[in-house]
């Protein structure tokens, strides 16, 4: 199904599913037990609680993601989505003009470092150097703009570090404001596909 939309992304180094087109998200050990809270998979799940856009730290970044629910927690574990196209359109004209030609840097290790200093392994750091993208992402098909910024965003060109981080947090909060999101409550067999160029999402990590 997903191959109809283009070449499939290969899962990154040091992840479950490495070397395949599948990223496996689980909190269950091979023996059926739950991973402890300090386990790397539990920490990665905490990192997925940050609003993010999949693979914006890669070149090329992900066009879309397809997520299928196989085994779900008895309660919790929802995924919340926000439209960054709407987020861009809701910005004041002055802010859109300011950001239109501005670029930002995206770094996998940056977002993981918010959870634990060494959550991103050395292999991940060496194979995923930070990348630069324009903050205004224009869809080549419909020419509509989106706000391409999320928790992986580590810097903005031409801005001091603290000033950039403050603006990044403000933009994420703006795009994900209450009343502008969709919360999906998973059922076994559900499949959701989304456009990473015009959305952010996060996993509600309340099942560990």
Name what the model sees in each region:
Residues 1-193, 197-208:
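Fe(II)/2-oxoglutarate oxygenase catalytic core
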